[in-house]
Amino acid sequence: MSDGTQKLWGGRFTGETDPLMHLYNASLPYDYKMYKADLEGTKVYTAGLQKLGLLTETELAKIHEGLAEIKKEWDADKFVRHPNDEDIHTANERRLGELIGRDIAGKVHTGRSRNDQVVTDLRIYCRDIVNDTLFPALKGLVEVLIKRAEGEIDVLMPGYTHLQRAQPIRWSHWLSSYATYFTEDYKRLGQILHRLNQSPLGAGALAGHPYGIDREFLAEGLGFNSVIGNSLVAVSDRDFIVELMFWGTLFMNHISRFAEDLIIYCTAEFGFIQLSDAYSTGSSLMPQKKNADSLELLRGKSGRVFGDLTGFLMSLKGIPSTYDKDMQEDKEPLFDCLTTVEHSMLIATGVISTLTVNKEKMEAALTMDMLATDLADYLVRKGVPFRETHHISGECVATAERLGLSGIDKLTLEQYQKIDSRFGQDLFETFNFEQSVERRDATGGTAKSAVLKQLDNLKSQLN
């Protein structure tokens, strides 16, 4: 007897499948993760068949009992896989036949193709991961950033451009910046969820369902928002996977930059923060080392997720319309992307919630040259055009450097007035870091009131 008789597609074949081809073709080693979605889809699909009169109520009840038993086996990690189980669909159908008999189990696939079955499973799986895993994990990360920002609102630090000290900011302003990035990711994920939550079930292999199944009934039963209106698109569309993976790459780009900042801040040269032991590792040779491996892995794994997306895009770009086996290559990069993103969220949350801030070192890193813009603003308030004040302030910086002074605050009033006569005694009030940040109180700025408004706004967006 040919092994083809054990396959869903075996009737046309008389020869044996090459053993390597069987392994090459099989996807159960990774698509088993969709077992819940597959069983759920079959449960609703068979209800649709019963509604058409293609199954009796008794048959439907037996099928649903069998599906429930299979779910228990998977949940308990007791499902026995067979060598001929090609994928999660064939494994579940084979086991259903063992439990309730092949005569009834053989009706389950009536009018359904693995083409619409697998993409239905994928959409359910992605939806569940977004709702049950990604949303809570990302919200938790943002909430930790907000909580920390509120608690350390009075800590000042240098803000950087080009990795050069630029202007004083609040540490909470930095925390709020990444809370903002991640909140945008949170909202973007909701938009993707709306688009992916459409039902392809009932589209058949490509041409549609031969028995006129109620696709709206199937969609409602599976919690989809709508039905994909073209059967060719229904079975072939993988844009929702591309979009979800692109979302993952964008999030990982944000988390990589977040990690890079913290890696810099925790070096001995900066000393702004110290990671907890829970998120650090040591050296096998140098006993004194405390390495920020959690952050370095966040940065490094971003490249992995980028590769998942680009690899799948290369698989997808040249295939003809409707279903092709190339599409089997969607699952491994998708699963890897989603798992990596989830773990990265949890690690980042742990890092930020347990690190220690060295307020003294942050504030000691503030230097008076960072107030050069404030000096220019001082003259603006006296009616001098900003482009002129920018040049004057730059001349003050150059003069202090030429005289070997430690900062522009060390120039005397006489020296200032030689540069520009409009400087007055009150210019020295400019040299105050707290006042500098408090002047920047417009929406989005680093003043305390502005940062607190940012945090309140982020909270409202999460809710």
From Swiss-Prot:
<comment type="subunit">
    <text>Homotetramer.</text>
</comment>
<comment type="pathway">
    <text>Amino-acid biosynthesis; L-arginine biosynthesis; L-arginine from L-ornithine and carbamoyl phosphate: step 3/3.</text>
</comment>
<dbReference type="GO" id="GO:0004056">
    <property type="term" value="F:argininosuccinate lyase activity"/>
</dbReference>
<dbReference type="InterPro" id="IPR022761">
    <property type="entry name" value="Fumarate_lyase_N"/>
</dbReference>
<feature type="binding site" description="in chain A">
    <location>
        <position position="323"/>
    </location>
    <ligand>
        <name>2-(N(omega)-L-arginino)succinate</name>
    </ligand>
</feature>
<feature type="active site" description="Proton acceptor">
    <location>
        <position position="162"/>
    </location>
</feature>
<dbReference type="GO" id="GO:0006526">
    <property type="term" value="P:L-arginine biosynthetic process"/>
</dbReference>
<dbReference type="InterPro" id="IPR009049">
    <property type="entry name" value="Argininosuccinate_lyase"/>
</dbReference>
<keyword id="KW-0597">Phosphoprotein</keyword>
<keyword id="KW-0456">Lyase</keyword>
<feature type="binding site" description="in chain B">
    <location>
        <position position="291"/>
    </location>
    <ligand>
        <name>2-(N(omega)-L-arginino)succinate</name>
    </ligand>
</feature>
<keyword id="KW-0055">Arginine biosynthesis</keyword>
<comment type="similarity">
    <text>Belongs to the lyase 1 family. Argininosuccinate lyase subfamily.</text>
</comment>
<dbReference type="InterPro" id="IPR024083">
    <property type="entry name" value="Fumarase/histidase_N"/>
</dbReference>
<feature type="site" description="Increases basicity of active site His">
    <location>
        <position position="296"/>
    </location>
</feature>
<feature type="binding site" description="in chain C">
    <location>
        <position position="161"/>
    </location>
    <ligand>
        <name>2-(N(omega)-L-arginino)succinate</name>
    </ligand>
</feature>
<dbReference type="InterPro" id="IPR029419">
    <property type="entry name" value="Arg_succ_lyase_C"/>
</dbReference>
<dbReference type="GO" id="GO:0005829">
    <property type="term" value="C:cytosol"/>
</dbReference>
<feature type="modified residue" description="Phosphoserine">
    <location>
        <position position="27"/>
    </location>
</feature>
<keyword id="KW-0028">Amino-acid biosynthesis</keyword>
<feature type="binding site" description="in chain A">
    <location>
        <position position="328"/>
    </location>
    <ligand>
        <name>2-(N(omega)-L-arginino)succinate</name>
    </ligand>
</feature>
<dbReference type="InterPro" id="IPR020557">
    <property type="entry name" value="Fumarate_lyase_CS"/>
</dbReference>
<feature type="active site" description="Proton donor">
    <location>
        <position position="283"/>
    </location>
</feature>
<feature type="binding site" description="in chain A">
    <location>
        <position position="27"/>
    </location>
    <ligand>
        <name>2-(N(omega)-L-arginino)succinate</name>
    </ligand>
</feature>
<feature type="binding site" description="in chain A">
    <location>
        <position position="115"/>
    </location>
    <ligand>
        <name>2-(N(omega)-L-arginino)succinate</name>
    </ligand>
</feature>
<dbReference type="InterPro" id="IPR008948">
    <property type="entry name" value="L-Aspartase-like"/>
</dbReference>
<dbReference type="InterPro" id="IPR000362">
    <property type="entry name" value="Fumarate_lyase_fam"/>
</dbReference>
<dbReference type="Pfam" id="PF14698">
    <property type="entry name" value="ASL_C2"/>
</dbReference>
<dbReference type="GO" id="GO:0042450">
    <property type="term" value="P:arginine biosynthetic process via ornithine"/>
</dbReference>
<protein>
    <recommendedName>
        <fullName>Argininosuccinate lyase</fullName>
        <ecNumber>4.3.2.1</ecNumber>
    </recommendedName>
</protein>
<feature type="binding site" description="in chain A">
    <location>
        <position position="331"/>
    </location>
    <ligand>
        <name>2-(N(omega)-L-arginino)succinate</name>
    </ligand>
</feature>
<dbReference type="Pfam" id="PF00206">
    <property type="entry name" value="Lyase_1"/>
</dbReference>
